[in-house]
Amino acid sequence: MQERADHFLELVNAGYQALYRVESEAQWLAATDVTPVHDAGSETAGKARAAFVGNPALIRETRALLEHRAELKPVTVLQLEHALLNAAEGPMTNPDLVAARIEAETRQASTLNGFTFHLNGQPITPNEIDNFLQTNQNLSARQAVWEASKQSGPALKPGLVKLRDLRNGVARELGYADYFALQVAGYGMSTAEMVKLQDDFMRELRPLYLQLHTWTKHALAKRYGQPVPKRIPAHWINNRWSQNWTSLIQAADLDDRFKDKTPEWIIKTAEQFYTGLGFPRLPDTFWTRSDLYPVKAGDARKKNTHASCWHLDLNTDIRSLMSVEANSEWFTTAHHELGHGYYFISYTRPEVPPLLRIGANPAFHEGMGELIALAAGQVPYLKSSGILPAEFQADQTAFLLNDALANSVPFIFWSSGTMTHWEADVYGKDLPPGQWNQRWWQYVRDFQGVEPPSDRGEEFCDAATKTHINDNPCYYYSYAIATVLKFQLHDHIARKLLKQPPQNCNYSNNKDVGRFLRGIMEKGGTEDWRKVLRQATGEDLSTRAMSEYFRPLLSWLEEQNRGRQIGWN
């Protein structure tokens, strides 16, 4: 039986890798230069890959082999299970349904990437929206820009309604209850188990979040000269979705430190972080094929502005799509995105078959990027990389507060709360489209303690303004898991390898850290993720490390909030 499986998987891996490359090339073109021709190419390539991975004969043989899993090597079983998950994304038992989904996703991506936002009748780019919310303190102007950022929702909603039904239909072809259930199956979990895990994260971190929320609304009320609200108005926060609360802590605002830097310097410095740990330099093709900087003003080309890293051929062709500018946020983002690139490099080796050139689970990929982003914000590293002067005296509380606000704690309540629960309802409970915006804002209010500045009726679809809702659905819990995971890995590195406090440590040029990270990454998807985590850190997935990292901050917040009403109910 093992010999039969080996022969079968040799063919499957070869076909999968070849068609993955063709589809990725087409998707790259469609993302970096949004045109009808490139959209059509992406759609055609998607159909070709789906025809292979969802072939009924392939599905039958995969299932037949899995009936004998006890006779097969563990890595063989993992490949077969992954092949079946791939097949469930495009089962050719119903080719018309799969074709309709691919066509709908291509149209949705084109609408999303090609949308032009307007403010007072003039075009405004996503980067300009973000920069405005980061810097402007005029509340009426902020509200106008925030509302402009939601303009894409009504344009995207019809396509999203159609896609919800098509994705659920595709998932049900191979026996999954719905598309959300198919996605969480990649973790070996059910929808109920995944939602419970996310609820557990929020329950364990809620005392910290309530203190942070209370401190933040008082700070913002003072900034804007307004009464302290129960819930924070969304346009008070410097992020379109209130997922990260950035630029609140002046002592930790490093943007001025980047004024003499270039976007090229930011990416090269991120690469040097990894080479200092013992990783190789990025391949030359990374620099010649990536799309790293914003489209120049007046250029007619449109591109996807969401930062990402691509493994185009599951081999050596690694690229990144970014819009890097010289500021602290892009400094962090560049370190994060290259984390994906070095994950690709680490598991691209003969021992890891193409089907398993993935993270131990999807969150491991995000977690590795997030871990390096956390390390890139540590004061000792900022000094060693020349951003902060050697004599700089850090306000440790300010940096911890910024860590919590900008990168971690509100993000859990956005990702575990609003995003996960809304998509579980939309896909898992077939929530009627006439209730989508009401349910969205119910969750934003309940989980995040945030409310819109004006009435948001069903003529809007504010969830659809988030990229992932359209092109990476039923996935966002992975970012929450990644956030928890980054603190576990960071805690282990700081305490066990560096013998330094997790809140103030430096990975720079430490080959032990590099070996630890490579030991996780080079496995790809060849081992169960729970086993990988236990082997690396000695513990199961837990918010313990995250809670301990912010324990000094919690004590400070409790002191600051003494006498204030905590929470929003």
Indicate where each model-derived feature is located.
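Active-site recognition of the HExxH zinc-binding catalytic motif
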Residues: E325-I345, E366-A373, A482
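C-terminal, non-catalytic "cap/extension" segments appended to globular domains
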Residues: M1-R4, P36-H38, L80-A83, A181, ...
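Active-site scaffold of zinc-dependent metalloenzymes
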Residues: S140, A144-E147, Q151, D299-N327, ...
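Post-HEXXH active-site segment of zinc metalloproteases
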Residues: F180-A181, S323, F344-L371, S385
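Extended, well-ordered alpha-helical scaffold/bundle regions in very large, multi-domain proteins
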Residues: A45-A48, G54, G188, A192, ...
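Post-HExxH zinc-binding segment in Zn-dependent metallohydrolases
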Residues: Q198-L208, I358-Q396
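N-terminal helix-rich structural modules
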Residues: M1-V161, T467, D471-Y477, R530-L533, ...
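Active-site-proximal, well-structured secondary-structure segments within enzyme catalytic domains
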Residues: Q122-N131, T135, V161-L321, A394-A406, ...
